[in-house]
Amino acid sequence: MTAESMMFNGAVILMVLVLFGLAWGFLILKIQGGEAE
């Protein structure tokens, strides 16, 4: 496993985690907002 492939895998994992975190946070905000109303 070369350093380039490790960097590429790390970038892919990082992007997936960021997208998952944004979706999760948006879902929680939506649920909390619905309960508040």
Curated annotation (Swiss-Prot):
It comes from the Bacteria. The keyword Transmembrane applies. It is found in: Cellular thylakoid membrane. It is a single-pass membrane protein. One of its GO terms (biological process) is photosynthesis. The chain crosses the membrane at residues 11-29. GO terms for molecular function: electron transfer activity. One of its GO terms (cellular component) is cytochrome b6f complex. This is Cytochrome b6-f complex subunit 7. Pfam families: PetM. Belongs to the PetM family. Keywords: Electron transport, Membrane, Photosynthesis, Thylakoid, Transmembrane, Transmembrane helix, Transport. The 4 large subunits of the cytochrome b6-f complex are cytochrome b6, subunit IV (17 kDa polypeptide, PetD), cytochrome f and the Rieske protein, while the 4 small subunits are PetG, PetL, PetM and PetN. The complex functions as a dimer. It comes from Crocosphaera subtropica (strain ATCC 51142 / BH68) (Cyanothece sp. (strain ATCC 51142)). Component of the cytochrome b6-f complex, which mediates electron transfer between photosystem II (PSII) and photosystem I (PSI), cyclic electron flow around PSI, and state transitions. The keyword Ribonucleoprotein does not apply.
